[in-house]
C-alpha cells in the first residue's frame, strides 16, 4: 500500500511517500524557522498561513521525487493532533480534500505516535515490546509500548517539556530561535561543574518529570553574575547536564520497573548529542539496547506520519470525511493495530 503522509502540527511542513513493500520512497520538509525567528518563537497564525502556502507544492514535489502518479496512492495520512489547532486544520483540510478528490481513504495520525514509530524506519528497527522516551518541545513522555496502538503512559512532564525548557532557558541567555540547538552549541564551550542545577523529581519514586524549575534556577544564577559569554556557556552546560541526568535516571528506572530490555528515544530533543551520549552510556552499562531515529527524523517530518498511517490503513482503520484536528489527544485512547 502506498501512503502519502502530511505533517503540519507546528512550524514545519512535511510530506512523504511510504510504500508498505518498498519502504520510504520520498520525503520533503520545509522549515518555517526564518519566518518565526524575528518573533523569538512560533506565531500560530504565521505557521498556519505558511503551511497553506507550501503544502500543495510539496505534495507535487514528493510525487515527482518518488516517481509516482496520484492514481497509485492508496491512502493519505495526516497529523490530527496534538499541536497548534490552526496548523493542524490546514493539514487536515488538504489531506481530506485530496482523499476525496482521489477517492482514497484518509487516516488521522497522532503526532507523538509518529515520533514513537520513527525508529522503525531505520534499517535495524526495534522489536516490540519496548520503553519509549518521547522528548520534544511540547511533550516529555515515558511510554510502555507492547505494539502499535498498545501504549501505557508511565510518566510525563507535569509542567514544561524538556524541549520547552531548552527554548525558554536559551531565551534567558539571549540566544536565537530555535533555542534548543543554540543552547546545545553554547554548552559545548561551558563547564558543567561550575554550577549545580537540581535534578527535578529524581529524589522520589515515580516516572513523572518537571523541568520548569530549571529555567527559574538558570535565571537566578544569571542574575547574580556579570553575564559574560563564559558565564552563559557554563550555565548552558550545567543546565543541559541536569536535563540529561534527569532523563537518564528516569529511563533507567522505567526499564527496571517494566523489565524490558529495549529503549526507543524519539522527538526533537533526541537529536541532542549530549542526550544521546548520556542514554547510550546508560544503556551500555545496564546492557539494554537503545534506538534513535536518524537526526532528520527526530524533528517533525512527514515520513513518520506516512509510516504510522500506513500501518493503520492496512489494518482497515480510517475515518469518514469529517476534518479532524485536536490540540490535545491522549495516546492511551488510540486503537490497537
UniProtKB/Swiss-Prot annotation:
What this protein catalyses is:
L-threonylcarbamoyladenylate + adenosine(37) in tRNA = N(6)-L-threonylcarbamoyladenosine(37) in tRNA + AMP + H(+)
Which top EC class applies here? transferase
The UniProt entry, under InterPro entries, shows: ATPase_NBD, Gcp-like_dom, KAE1/TsaD, TsaD
A GO BP term here is: tRNA threonylcarbamoyladenosine modification
The residues listed in the UniProt record as binding Fe cation, with positions renumbered to this chain, are 111, 115, 300
One GO CC annotation? cytoplasm
Q: Which GO molecular function, any one, fits this protein according to its record?
A: N(6)-L-threonylcarbamoyladenine synthase activity
Cite the entry's keywords alphabetically. Acyltransferase, Cytoplasm, Iron, Metal-binding, Transferase, tRNA processing
Q: Which domain of life is it from?
A: Bacteria
On cofactor binding, the record's note says: Binds 1 Fe(2+) ion per subunit.
Protein's recorded name: tRNA N6-adenosine threonylcarbamoyltransferase
Gene that this polypeptide is encoded by: tsaD
Amino acid at each position: 500500500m502506498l501512503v502519502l503522509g502530511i505533517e503540519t502540527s507546528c512550524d514545519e511542513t512535511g510530506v512523504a511517500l511510504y510504500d508498505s513493500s518498498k519502504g520510504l520512497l520520498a520525503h520533503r520538509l520545509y522549515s518555517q524557522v526564518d519566518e518565526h525567528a524575528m518573533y523569538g518563537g512560533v506565531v500560530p497564525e504565521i505557521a498556519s498561513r505558511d503551511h497553506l502556502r507550501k503544502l500543495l507544492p510539496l505534495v507535487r514535489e514528493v510525487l515527482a521525487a518518488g516517481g509516482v502518479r496520484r492514481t497509485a496512492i492508496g491512502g493519505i495520512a495526516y497529523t490530527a493532533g496534538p499541536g497548534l489547532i490552526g496548523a493542524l486544520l490546514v493539514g487536515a483540510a488538504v489531506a481530506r480534500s485530496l482523499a476525496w478528490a482521489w477517492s482514497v481513504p484518509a487516516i488521522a495520525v497522532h503526532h507523538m505516535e509518529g515520533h514513537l514509530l520513527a525508529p522503525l524506519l531505520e534499517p535495524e528497527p526495534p522489536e516490540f515490546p519496548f520503553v519509549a522516551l518521547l522528548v520534544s518541545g511540547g511533550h516529555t513522555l515515558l511510554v510502555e509500548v507492547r505494539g502499535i496502538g498498545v501504549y501505557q503512559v508511565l510518566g510525563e512532564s507535569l509542567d514544561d517539556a524538556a524541549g520547552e525548557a531548552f527554548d525558554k532557558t536559551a531565551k534567558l541567555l539571549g540566544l536565537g530561535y530555535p533555542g534548543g540547538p543554540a543552547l546545545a552549541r553554547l554548552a559545548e564551550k561551558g563547564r558543567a561543574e561550575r554550577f549545580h542545577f537540581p535534578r527535578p523529581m529524581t529524589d522520589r519514586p515515580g516516572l513523572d518529570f518537571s523541568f520548569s524549575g530549571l529555567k527559574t534556577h538558570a535565571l537566578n544564577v544569571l542574575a547574580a553574575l556579570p553575564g559574560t559569554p563564559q558565564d552563559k556557556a557554563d550555565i548552558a552546560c550545567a543546565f543541559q547536564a541536569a536535563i540529561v541526568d534527569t532523563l537518564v535516571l528516569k529511563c533507567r528506572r522505567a526499564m527496571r520497573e517494566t523489565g524490558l530490555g529495549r529503549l526507543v528515544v524519539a522527538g526533537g530533543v533526541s537529536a541532542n548529542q549530549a542526550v544521546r551520549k548520556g542514554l547510550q552510556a546508560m544503556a551500555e552499562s545496564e546492557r539494554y539496547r537503545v534506538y534513535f531515529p536518524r537526526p532528520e527524523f527526530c524533528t517533525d517530518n512527514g515520513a513518520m506520519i506516512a509510516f504510522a498511517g500506513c500501518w493503520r490503513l492496512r489494518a482497515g482503520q480510517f475515518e469518514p470525511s469529517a476534518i479532524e484536528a485536536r490540540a490535545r489527544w491522549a495516546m492511551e485512547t488510540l486503537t490497537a493495530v
